[in-house]
Amino acid sequence: MSHNTFGHLFRVTTWGESHGPALGCVVDGCPPGIRFTLAEVQAWLDKRKPGQSRFVTQRREDDLVKVLSGVMLDDDGETMISTGTPISMMIENTDQRSKDYSEIAKRYRPGHADYTYDAKYGIRDYRGGGRSSARETAARVAAGAIARKVVPGLVVRGALVQIGKHRIDRSNWDWAEVNNNPFFAPDPAIVPVWEEYLDGIRKAGSSIGAVVEVVAEGVPAGIGAPIYAKLDQDIAANLMSINAVKGVEIGNGFAAAEISGEENADEMRIGAQGEPVFLSNNAGGILGGIATGQPVVARFAIKPTSSILTERRSIDSDGKEVDVRTKGRHDPCVGIRAVPIGEAMLACAIADHYLRDRGQTGRLK
């Protein structure tokens, strides 16, 4: 299997499977002198890990990360300092139940990558989906923790803005609420609605889709590139690579098709300190593939997981027609735990473009 690496200067390679002994990543291209602690990396992994509420998979993984290379300890015994060599991180799997998947060893789950992996490689890891499992994304979150440290002043946040047909009220948006509920919802009023709705989905053994919004603040104006190396192009690619993602938009995205040029264009004025000021941010912080200095805003849509208890029609690898129902432990809405994953992938794209701009223009420190 190829294509396990993304990025240009800030390059991330992930490895491992859902039911293997461990998984992890290698971050290559991180500049020397980047300071971070194991606790900081662990905090982001804790945000993504399973089993934290009844609304996510009950697989119990502590997701304890180990840093194996690419750093030296500071005198305080806690702070790690990057050396400029590859940073390797590992997370052990401890709660696999491969027997739960024995019934689908030859059967293709409708809506899952079972068939396409078999079509491409002639073999597939049916135990939890192997590399196609969202378990792989734990390694991306670890890499994203490093990426956040590369760009000075960068703040990346995410929130769940829609589950099924139930959307947040954007006038209630409060970042302080995101970590106060099991959905990473910025609107406290939507929480009881989602709780009741997802309880019904969960008890029925079904699943539902969602929309996640990620925002990066402190992105330097000018990073990115035109035409074939656009910042938004790479952000979209990173987000699209996340399991179950079926659509990505930047700024007002598809809503731009419904408004006029007068409404869509972000007008400008000169600020109190002589700096350029935008009067809106329909562009989502990117114009012509290059950052404007405004917050970078992206959203991505996530399909319902195909691992459900309802029987669905399918075929098996012997060419027989079968009915498939998936046992095991699964998220009724994978969009919840996709929030920190989206944050990590956005951070990695921005860190990569920051280093590329610094190498090309020399204007960034």
Swiss-Prot record:
- Biological process annotations from GO: amino acid biosynthetic process; aromatic amino acid family biosynthetic process; chorismate biosynthetic process
Return the cofactor note field. Answer: Reduced FMN (FMNH(2)).
* E.C. code: 4.2.3.5
Q: Where does NADP(+) bind?
A: 48, 54
Signal sequence, start to end: none
* Substrates-to-products reaction catalysed: 5-O-(1-carboxyvinyl)-3-phosphoshikimate = chorismate + phosphate
Q: Where does FMN bind?
A: 131-133, 243-244, 288, 303-307, 329
The Gene Ontology terms for molecular function here are: chorismate synthase activity; FMN binding
Q: How does it assemble?
A: Homotetramer.
Protein name according to UniProt: Chorismate synthase
